[in-house]
A protein has these predicted regions:
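Mg2+-dependent phosphoryl-transfer enzymes with acidic/Ser/Thr/Gly-rich catalytic loops
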Residues: 10, 29-35, 182-261
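Short, well-ordered alpha-helix to beta-strand connector turns
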Residues: 36, 68-69, 94, 101, ...
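Residue-level marker for buried hydrophobic side chains located in beta-strands
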Residues: 39-41, 98, 201
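Catalytic P-loop NTPase motifs of RecA-like helicase/translocase cores
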Residues: 47-49, 208
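Active-site phosphate-binding/coordination module
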Residues: 50-134
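Phosphate- and divalent-cation-binding pockets in alpha/beta enzyme and binding domains
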Residues: 57, 81-84, 106, 153, ...
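Conserved acidic, metal-coordinating active-site core of Asp-based
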Residues: 120-214, 223, 229
């Protein structure tokens, strides 16, 4: 159930920038800004576009928000992949986050991994395997298999083992069976004492909904999957968040942002 948290005002303004967000018509809404102290962002499709680039308007918004709110990532990417995609300057604005779909958590100068067992006997020597680890602990690995029959055989055998398997041809990704963005966000909120009513999670895919559903403020980006936009409390792009939320003053950035692979 959606809750109205704004004032309704009458306006005869034409071509106002808010019409792009609120829609055309005589009635438009002036929001009563909720207080937000922490924001979690997905990366692919949320901060980064289809070409893997972060729009400059989003980058500027992140720099602005980082001055007064705690920023965290919540992504299927490993930590080094997220750093490469965002670039060091933007990545360093974040205090940590949930990486590899919950396989690795980074916060308060700590890094915690959910180890996943590697099964070389399943995928063989002919497959291209990328292993992501921290201090020798493997928390995610990906297998590139272009042959469909071979890929299906590997998938079948992997699913017989205690691991979580994601498949988007030609790539197979393996993480700990209990890892998830939702559990990662919950663990960070508990460890850091983050209040749900002051936490915002921003995503673009229906797969992001479980982690978005555990906080009071969920936001889908404008080009998100329709089903996610139906469920999310807000539909806004990252560069519009400051117009609709009141951000608290945060402490200086304190994070661990390096990853061993």
């Amino acid at each position: 159930r959606k809750v109205c948290d704004c004032y309704i005002a009458f306006s005869n303004l034409n071509n106002h920038p808010l019409h792009r967000i609120m829609g055309e018509g005589a009635f438009w809404r002036i929001p009563d800004k909720p207080l937000i102290t922490t924001v979690f962002f997905d990366v692919d499709g949320t901060l980064a576009d289809s070409q893997g680039k972060v729009p400059e308007s989003y980058a500027n918004a992140l720099r602005y928000m980082a001055q007064s709110v705690s920023l965290y990532l919540a992504t299927s990417l490993s930590m080094e992949q997220a750093k490469k995609k965002l670039g060091k300057a933007l990545f360093d604005l974040f205090r940590g986050g949930v990486f590899a779909d919950g396989g690795l958590l980074s916060y308060s100068r700590q890094i915690k991994c959910l180890p996943v067992k590697v099964y070389p006997e399943v995928y063989g020597e002919s497959s291209k395997v990328t292993i992501h680890s921290y201090e020798g602990v493997v928390y995610k690995y990906s297998i590139l298999v272009r042959d469909k029959e071979q890929r299906e055989s590997i998938l079948t055998r992997l699913k017989e083992n205690p691991c979580q398997v994601f498949h988007k041809a030609p790539l197979i990704t393996v993480i700990h069976p209990e890892a998830s963005k939702k559990e990662g966000v919950l663990q960070l909120c508990k460890a850091l004492g983050l209040a749900s009513e002051h936490t915002l999670v921003v995503g673009n895919s229906l797969k992001d909904w479980p982690m978005m559903s555990v906080v009071s403020h969920s936001c889908a980006v404008m080009n998100a999957e329709p089903l996610l936009k139906e469920r999310a409390r807000y539909t806004l792009n990252p560069d519009r968040l400051a117009a609709f939320f009141r951000f608290s003053n945060g402490d200086p950035i304190d994070q661990t942002s390096s990853d061993n692979s």
